[in-house]
């Protein structure tokens, strides 16, 4: 039987980073301050803030942010008294210069994120973060796309570069509970005892909280979650729900549940221009194993070309597209449009391919 945790869990909030996807990266500085103040009052351990795609993610490909990463980071740093300010960096999107600037703005935790089979590209960023004295975390995205043993070897690479914690990141919300269990057991087999592990869940199959609980049962130290589940796709594990479940299990988490409940309903949920929930489109993400932040891009392409969002998402999953390939969503839409036109014996309208 799995042992119950006796240590205090590290609660990592991602409302102001992953949650940015849910509103197309349009958080105002006032939104950021209000959310950060509520999270700080609830005593979460860290608050991650950046464009949804990490430092320097604001771009034509990913979507432009309402503010710069440094403005958002500084707003959180000026607000909090307890929580540490965290940020996310994807090598190839964010640079060492961006990391230094984020540190100067107040970030003290960085999660260096790569695709689950590409940990080797994180070396210089992890090493530099350690030089800065940051709490340095490896973040293995789309963890469902490789085996537990192979994922563990990638985690070991990140550990060897200096990562103090390595995450199983279910970017597609596609992992089942046994999948999570097997990945944490594989981590335990190869990582040093002092290296922490973390779980970042998405709720596309409604398993965000369940998978986080399984991870903790397997020795996970850090849990990502967001207020009202605010995040890409069907969102992350809802923070207030996870804390309520952890409380009922008798786990030490250090957070004020009622403050989180109020913040979720009174501050965060009203910001959603598209409900963050499991529905036809977000369920397709988890079913097909598609990167959750593709949702809004796929919906835009579907509207533009008169296609079904689910059809685009399922095709993206079939082609095993990964984070960073947002530009391919339009290509997939055009391929589907051409296929449909060919079946109907029609040419693709020239306006559609312009």
UniProtKB/Swiss-Prot annotation:
Its EC number is 4.1.3.39. Substrate binds at residues 17-18, 171, 200, 291. The record marks 17 as: Transition state stabilizer. CDD domains: DRE_TIM_HOA. InterPro entries: 2-IPM_HCS-like, 4OH_2_O-val_aldolase, Aldolase_TIM, DmpG_comm, DRE_TIM_HOA, PYR_CT. Mn(2+) binds at residues 18, 200, 202. Pfam families: DmpG_comm (PF07836), HMGL-like (PF00682). Keywords: Aromatic hydrocarbons catabolism, Lyase, Manganese, Metal-binding. PANTHER family: 2-ISOPROPYLMALATE SYNTHASE 1, CHLOROPLASTIC-RELATED (PTHR10277:SF9), HOMOCITRATE SYNTHASE-RELATED (PTHR10277). Belongs to the 4-hydroxy-2-oxovalerate aldolase family. This is 4-hydroxy-2-oxovalerate aldolase 2. It comes from Cupriavidus necator (strain ATCC 17699 / DSM 428 / KCTC 22496 / NCIMB 10442 / H16 / Stanier 337) (Ralstonia eutropha). The lineage of its organism: Bacteria, Pseudomonadati, Pseudomonadota, Betaproteobacteria, Burkholderiales.
């Amino acid at each position: 039987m799995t042992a119950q945790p006796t240590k205090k869990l590290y609660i990592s909030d991602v409302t102001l980073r992953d949650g940015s996807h849910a509103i197309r990266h349009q958080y105002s500085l006032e939104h950021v301050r209000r959310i950060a103040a509520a999270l700080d009052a609830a005593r979460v351990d860290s608050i991650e803030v950046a464009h949804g795609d990490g430092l320097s993610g604001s771009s034509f490909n990913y979507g432009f942010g309402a503010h710069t990463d440094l403005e958002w980071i500084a707003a959180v740093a000026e607000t909090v008294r307890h929580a540490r300010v965290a940020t996310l960096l994807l090598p190839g999107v964010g640079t060492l210069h961006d990391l230094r600037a984020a540190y100067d703005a107040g970030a003290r935790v960085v999660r260096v994120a790569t695709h689950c089979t590409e940990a080797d590209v994180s070396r210089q960023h992890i090493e530099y973060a350690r030089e800065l004295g940051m709490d340095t975390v490896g973040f293995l995205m789309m963890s469902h796309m490789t085996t537990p043993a192979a994922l563990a070897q990638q985690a070991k690479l990140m550990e060897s570069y200096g990562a103090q914690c390595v995450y199983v990141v279910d970017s597609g919300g596609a992992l089942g509970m046994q999948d999570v269990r097997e990945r944490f057991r594989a981590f335990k087999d190869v990582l040093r005892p002092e290296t922490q592990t973390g779980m970042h869940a998405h709720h596309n199959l409604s398993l965000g909280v369940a998978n986080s609980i399984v991870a903790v049962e397997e020795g996970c130290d850090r849990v990502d979650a967001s207020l009202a589940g605010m995040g890409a796709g069907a969102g992350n594990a809802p923070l207030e729900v996870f804390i309520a479940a952890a409380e009922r299990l008798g786990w030490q988490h250090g957070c004020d549940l009622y403050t989180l409940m109020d913040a979720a309903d009174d501050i965060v949920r009203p910001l959603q221009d598209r409900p963050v929930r499991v529905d036809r489109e977000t369920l397709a993400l988890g079913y097909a194993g598609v990167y959750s932040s593709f949702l809004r891009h796929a919906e835009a392409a579907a509207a533009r070309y008169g296609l079904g969002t689910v059809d685009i998402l399922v095709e993206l999953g079939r082609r095993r597209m990964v984070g960073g390939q947002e530009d391919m969503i339009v290509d997939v839409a055009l391929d589907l449009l051409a296929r449909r036109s060919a079946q109907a014996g029609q040419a693709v309208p020239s306006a559609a391919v312009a």
